[in-house]
Curated annotation (Swiss-Prot):
Catalyzes the transfer of L-fucose, from a guanosine diphosphate-beta-L-fucose, to the terminal galactose on both O- and N-linked glycans chains of cell surface glycoproteins and glycolipids and the resulting epitope regulates several processes such as cell-cell interaction including host-microbe interaction, cell surface expression and cell proliferation. Preferentially fucosylates gangliosides GA1 and GM1 in the antrum, cecum and colon and in the female reproductive organs. It is found in: Golgi apparatus, Golgi stack membrane. This is Galactoside alpha-(1,2)-fucosyltransferase 2. The lineage of its organism: Eukaryota, Metazoa, Chordata, Craniata, Vertebrata. Glycans are attached at residues 189, 255, 283, 309. It catalyses: a beta-D-galactosyl-(1->3)-N-acetyl-beta-D-glucosaminyl derivative + GDP-beta-L-fucose = an alpha-L-Fuc-(1->2)-beta-D-Gal-(1->3)-beta-D-GlcNAc derivative + GDP + H(+); a beta-D-galactosyl-(1->4)-N-acetyl-beta-D-glucosaminyl derivative + GDP-beta-L-fucose = an alpha-L-Fuc-(1->2)-beta-D-Gal-(1->4)-beta-D-GlcNAc derivative + GDP + H(+); a ganglioside GM1 + GDP-beta-L-fucose = a ganglioside Fuc-GM1 + GDP + H(+); a neolactoside nLc4Cer + GDP-beta-L-fucose = a neolactoside IV(2)-alpha-Fuc-nLc4Cer + GDP + H(+). Pathway: Protein modification; protein glycosylation. It comes from Bos taurus. Expressed in brain, heart, lung, intestin and kidney.
């Protein structure tokens, strides 16, 4: 009696090829995990400017952080950027109030999620007040559910994350294109300018608040003449794009007879996107005072002239505001004329 035995033959060549391919992919993946892509390093380089140290973000812990949404556009940009930076520094998830989203989202491509009011009301928040400058204690803020308060708007909070902050405050395409189309149409004595300087003149309530409350001044005609002349001496045929919440005053006090000044802003504080976009799309900035001008200069990059020393030494404003924390070290200050305050 013969026994029948059946043999199964596995194809040798395909099997060896499969093992070789799988081994190659596995070891390649292991090597890639140990390498940092060069584009990541390049993207981080701008964020290292002018900051003494780069704090490492902690692993994200449980809980959530938010911040008060108070003030107009410049204030809320400062609040957003501060929340973004401090939450990351402390390893917490960050959420913004709906009011902040309504202010910023129509203009910028922000990414922080919204914490709706119904949810926020059920959270046991711990309020944590911030000064308008970075302090060491803010690196170790206790609490899982923290609501940051105050009016923080200082590069000392977030400049180590400059590349990320610029990404958060990227203009929507239609906002940017409208501003760029306007700028492309400008001419200086018939020629297209090669250098665009945004000029923001803060007037409005500050005209009365600064002298009567803060023992300070707003920018005058002489300051603006000096600032414009600084750029005229440095660049060939620049054009100055003026935005203000006091455009009538600007037309009366800024000399446009050379043909290099354009009064472009609408001064509408309720819809600031157009004015802000125009300023950020310029190469350089002249600002006076206020967070609107500070942020326009920060996003534009380039060279910035600002009004310096615009309060008396005993001003109560200096208890809540540090000029060195508001203006980047590389920006150039022109001292204000305080003589009107000394006449009283």
């Amino acid at each position: 009696m013969f026994s029948t035995q059946t043999f199964f033959f596995f194809p040798t060549a395909p099997f060896i090829l499969f093992v070789f391919t799988a081994s190659t992919i596995f070891h390649l993946h292991q090597r890639l995990e140990k390498m940092q892509p060069t584009w990541e390093l390049e993207a981080l380089e701008p964020a290292t400017m002018e900051t003494p140290s780069r704090p490492q973000p902690r692993p994200q812990l449980k809980g959530m952080w938010t911040i008060n949404a108070i003030g107009r556009l410049g204030n809320q940009m400062g609040e957003y950027a501060t929340l973004y930076a401090l939450a990351k520094m402390n390893g917490r998830a960050a959420f913004i109030p709906p009011q902040m989203h309504s202010t910023l989202a129509p203009i910028f491509r922000i990414t922080l999620p919204v914490l709706h009011d119904a949810t926020a009301r059920s959270v046991p928040w711990q309020n944590y007040h911030l000064n308008d400058w970075m302090e060491e204690q803010y690196r170790h803020i206790p609490g899982e559910y923290v609501r940051l308060t105050g009016y923080p708007c200082s590069w000392t909070f977030y400049h180590h994350l400059r590349a990320e902050i610029l990404q958060e405050f990227t203009l929507h395409a239609h906002v940017r294109e409208e501003a760029q189309n306007f700028l492309r149409g400008l001419r200086v004595n018939g020629s297209r300018p090669s250098t665009y300087v945004g000029v923001h003149v803060r007037r409005g309530d500050y005209v009365h608040v600064m002298p009567n409350v803060w023992k300070g001044v707003v920018a005058d005609r002489r300051y603006l003449e000096q600032a414009l002349d600084w750029f005229r001496a440095r660049y060939s045929a620049p054009i100055f794009v003026v935005s203000s919440n006091g455009m009538a005053w600007c037309r009366e006090n800024i000399n446009a007879s050379r043909g290099d000044v354009v009064f472009a802003g609408n001064g509408n504080e309720g819809s600031p996107a157009k004015d802000f976009a125009l300023l950020t799309q310029c190469n350089h900035t002249i600002m006076t005072i206020g967070t609107f001008g500070i942020w326009a200069a920060y996003l534009a990059g380039g060279e910035t002239i600002y009004l310096a020393n615009y309060t008396l030494p005993d001003s109560p404003f200096l208890k809540i505001f540090k000029p060195e924390a508001a203006f980047l070290p590389k920006w150039i200050g022109i001292p204000a004329d305080l003589s009107p305050l000394l006449k009283h």
